């Protein structure tokens, strides 16, 4: 299986090619056109398919791993001798489709038992988050850590919840200085990893392993905690149709959010 450094080099090359290919069609009806139904049973937009095809071609050329799981193509053979990659070719497809510059290539690499490398690049800005298991997390090569804020009153959090869930949160005392919902979960988890947000909470039950694999490793390697909203282990199956609820937060505030969630 490819080394983490080799994996990052391929991802860098792929990300540059994707950004160039998408640039003329981001924010256009052509790029946003739904052209097929993906393996996750949701519509695939043209820009997703273009990005996925670029990744598949490059990963096969470099034999990055044995298999790759993508929400568009499902599980496909790559040709390497070991390992599984988890791909979201355009995390934040809606943002890309309407021209909001917050969408990313997200790729996690597993040795078959655990994630060993994660790569998330904002395709609009080029900012790149990476992590290697046991080696820390980085943005554009600089080490990152979560914030140490522990009070809801001073924290900024990304929260995805339907009206009944949000109502229950508020009725049980949830407050936050700022709530953000930016539309690209991998990038938002990375924002927790580098201290721009204190927490990411998704209660919809729709987040899949392809959405989160890379960013979870990045957040954990940075020093944050990822769990179910109530604090238990969050385990994703290799199934693009199976979603989970998730809490990713700095260590100081994670327990407080999990305690609140157990009241719901």
Which functions belong to the PLM regions below?
Residues 1-90:
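N-terminal subdomain of lithium-sensitive/metallo-dependent phosphomonoesterases centered on the IMPase/IPPase/PAP
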Residues 8, 61, 146-264:
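An extended, acidic
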Residues 70-72, 121, 160:
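Short His-Asn-centered micro-motif
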């Amino acid at each position: 299986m490819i080394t983490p450094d080799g994996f990052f080099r391929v991802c860098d090359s792929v990300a540059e090619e994707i950004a160039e290919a998408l640039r003329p069609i981001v924010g256009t009806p052509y790029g946003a056109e739904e052209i097929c139904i993906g393996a996750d049973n949701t519509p695939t937009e043209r820009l997703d398919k273009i990005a996925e095809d670029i990744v598949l071609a490059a990963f096969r050329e470099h034999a990055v791993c044995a298999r790759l799981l993508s929400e568009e193509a499902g599980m496909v053979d790559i040709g390497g001798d070991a390992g599984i990659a988890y791909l979201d070719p355009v995390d934040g497809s809606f943002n890309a489709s309407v021209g909001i510059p917050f969408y990313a290539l997200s790729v996690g690499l597993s040795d078959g038992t655990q994630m060993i490398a994660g790569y998330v690049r904002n395709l609009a800005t080029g900012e790149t988050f990476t992590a290697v298991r046991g080696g820390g997390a980085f943005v554009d090569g600089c080490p990152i850590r979560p914030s140490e804020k522990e009070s809801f009153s001073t924290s900024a959090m990304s929260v995805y919840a339907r009206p009944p869930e949000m109502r229950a949160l508020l009725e049980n005392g949830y407050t936050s200085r700022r709530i953000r919902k930016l539309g690209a979960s991998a990038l938002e988890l990375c924002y927790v990893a580098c201290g721009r947000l204190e927490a990411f909470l998704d209660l919809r039950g729709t987040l899949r392993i392809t959405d989160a694999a890379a960013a979870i490793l990045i957040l954990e390697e940075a020093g944050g905690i990822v769990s179910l909203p109530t604090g238990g282990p969050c385990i994703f199956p290799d199934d693009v149709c199976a979603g989970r609820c998730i809490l990713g937060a700095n260590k100081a505030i994670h327990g407080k959010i999990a305690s609140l969630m157990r009241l719901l």
